[in-house]
């Protein structure tokens, strides 16, 4: 180990704007996936071990879009199986799980339970670092993952009420996730992702979604 991680309290102080740390806190493993390096995987893992990041990043077991978990078949984002060939020839941003908004009632009626016992498959013991519960796919990311990017951007204008209902259900799931992260992981913060901006501007008009993000 070439550097020692910053203590939890120092990072918390920086994040909360109460003071500085002995150096800039670093989260450097976000896009460093050792298996992606093929025959250099061991070398990359060793490098990451030499330069540990200043937080324990703890992921959650996200529902799959179509496939439930063995111990909870309804722990999935939509309440029906993937049609055969649905993804053939389609990029990840052009796949449409919710093909028509008439399916929304069933999706919401069978929305995954945020009290699912396996929500946090790994609960590592505190190691002295700041603890981050990691959530992939914020509101808009989950929206386009279910509707496809082009449909999602049009939905803001053509089906705003349906979008709000979907976001409401997703927000309720996320709020319970937040509570459990604090209770079960003693998380200091939530690290979540969303597709809100481009290199030059926000991705869509803030007027469309500010109320959904306010909570």
Segments from the language model and where they lie:
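Active-site loop segments of alpha/beta catalytic cores
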Residues: 1-39, 102-215
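Short beta-alpha junction loops
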Residues: 30-32, 61-64
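Short C-terminal domain-edge/linker segments immediately following a structured domain
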Residues: 55-62, 89, 161-166
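A contiguous, low-structure linker/loop signature
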Residues: 64-114, 125-134
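N-acyltransferase acceptor-side catalytic subdomain
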Residues: 8, 28, 57-59, 76-85
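Glycine-rich loop at the start of a catalytic domain that most often binds anionic cofactors/ligands
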Residues: 37-48, 68-75
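Catalytic domains of carbohydrate-active enzymes, especially glycoside hydrolases
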Residues: 43-62, 184
């Amino acid at each position: 180990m070439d550097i020692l991680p910053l203590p939890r309290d120092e990072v918390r102080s920086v994040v909360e704007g109460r003071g500085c740390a002995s150096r800039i806190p670093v989260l450097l493993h976000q896009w460093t996936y050792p298996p992606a390096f093929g025959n250099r995987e061991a070398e990359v893992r060793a490098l990451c071990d030499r330069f540990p990041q200043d937080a324990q990043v703890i992921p959650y077991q996200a529902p799959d879009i179509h496939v439930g978990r063995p111990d909870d078949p309804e722990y999935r984002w939509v309440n029906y199986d993937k049609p055969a060939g649905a993804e053939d020839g389609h990029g990840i941003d052009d796949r449409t799980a919710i093909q028509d908004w008439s399916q929304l009632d069933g999706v919401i009626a069978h929305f995954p339970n945020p009290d699912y016992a396996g929500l946090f498959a790994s609960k590592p013991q505190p190691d002295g670092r700041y603890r981050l519960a990691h959530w992939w796919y914020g509101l808009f990311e989950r929206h386009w993952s279910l509707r496809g990017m082009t449909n999602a951007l049009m939905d803001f204008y053509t089906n705003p009420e349906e979008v709000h209902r979907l976001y409401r259900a997703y927000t309720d799931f996320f709020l319970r996730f937040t509570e459990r992260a604090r209770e079960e992981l003693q998380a200091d913060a939530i690290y979540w992702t969303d597709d809100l901006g481009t290199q030059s501007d926000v991705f869509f008009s803030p007027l469309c979604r500010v109320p959904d993000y306010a909570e």
